[in-house]
């Protein structure tokens, strides 16, 4: 019994100290991480900040196009509904107008006046809707021009930076063995495929 107790005491003495928050525990964890402590960013290192910024601009542009399309569809629905309401009121008005004036009752005359006023209000509402759509269209054209200028300005320096970085990487990197050819497509090549090196096809 005394031998077992002495052995357990000896093993506990040799066991390394790993207290929560202790310096020994922190040092032990740091040694286990190894090269992982050298990681600075989890982002893809093949993309430059300029490429990331341009990609974000393209995504923002796509989002704007989707919002515009939703607005256009809402305008079309409102316009169709207004046209239906106007046509229904006109049809009812034509039926009342077809009745001779002497044969019309007081209620029919009042209804005729109400229909004329309703049709007038709906026509005005549709005119306002068309005017708003035209103003929105002009604003979108101005935004398209600004975005085209932005992409053109961003693509010029990015083209130079990509070419210089690609040439420097080609000098440092040895040629791959012929049995394992590799083809790397840079971010600029992807941008050219989408935007034609000047502006996005969406515009």
Swiss-Prot record:
<feature type="domain" description="bMERB">
    <location>
        <begin position="3"/>
        <end position="149"/>
    </location>
</feature>
<dbReference type="Pfam" id="PF12130">
    <property type="entry name" value="bMERB_dom"/>
</dbReference>
<protein>
    <recommendedName>
        <fullName>bMERB domain-containing protein 1</fullName>
    </recommendedName>
</protein>
<dbReference type="GO" id="GO:0015630">
    <property type="term" value="C:microtubule cytoskeleton"/>
</dbReference>
<dbReference type="InterPro" id="IPR040127">
    <property type="entry name" value="C16orf45-like"/>
</dbReference>
<dbReference type="GO" id="GO:0021814">
    <property type="term" value="P:cell motility involved in cerebral cortex radial glia guided migration"/>
</dbReference>
<dbReference type="GO" id="GO:0007026">
    <property type="term" value="P:negative regulation of microtubule depolymerization"/>
</dbReference>
<feature type="region of interest" description="Disordered">
    <location>
        <begin position="160"/>
        <end position="186"/>
    </location>
</feature>
<dbReference type="GO" id="GO:0021822">
    <property type="term" value="P:negative regulation of cell motility involved in cerebral cortex radial glia guided migration"/>
</dbReference>
<dbReference type="InterPro" id="IPR022735">
    <property type="entry name" value="bMERB_dom"/>
</dbReference>
<dbReference type="GO" id="GO:0007019">
    <property type="term" value="P:microtubule depolymerization"/>
</dbReference>
């Amino acid at each position: 019994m005394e031998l077992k107790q002495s052995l357990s005491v000896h093993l506990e003495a040799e066991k390394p100290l790993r207290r929560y928050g202790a310096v020994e525990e922190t040092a032990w964890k740091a040694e286990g991480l190894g090269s992982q402590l050298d990681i600075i960013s989890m982002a893809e290192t093949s993309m430059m900040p300029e490429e990331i910024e341009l990609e974000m601009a393209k995504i923002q542009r796509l989002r704007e196009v989707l919002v515009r399309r939703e607005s256009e569809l809402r305008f079309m629905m409102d316009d169709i509904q207004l046209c239906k309401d106007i046509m229904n009121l006109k049809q009812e008005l034509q039926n009342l107008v077809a009745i001779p004036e002497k044969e019309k009752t007081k209620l029919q005359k009042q209804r005729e006046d109400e229909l004329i006023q309703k049709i007038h209000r709906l026509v005005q509402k549709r005119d306002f809707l068309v005017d708003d759509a035209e103003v929105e269209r002009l604003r979108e054209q101005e935004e398209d021009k600004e975005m085209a200028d932005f992409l053109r300005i961003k693509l010029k320096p990015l083209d130079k930076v990509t070419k210089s970085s690609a040439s420097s990487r080609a000098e440092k990197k040895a040629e791959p063995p012929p049995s394992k050819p590799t083809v790397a497509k840079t971010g600029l090549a992807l941008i050219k495929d989408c935007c034609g090196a000047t502006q996005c096809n969406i515009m």
